[in-house]
UniProtKB/Swiss-Prot annotation:
Miscellaneous comment as given in the Swiss-Prot or TrEMBL entry: On the 2D-gel the determined pI of this unknown protein is: 5.9, its MW is: 26.5 kDa.
Protein name: Unknown protein from spot 443 of 2D-PAGE of etiolated coleoptile
Length: 18
């Protein structure tokens, strides 16, 4: 999620992992 500067993008990554 470090590649994403926005929290929303980081959240998306978390969902993608799940």
């Amino acid at each position: 999620a470090k590649n994403y500067p926005t929290v929303s993008a980081e959240y998306s990554x978390a969902v993608e992992k799940a």
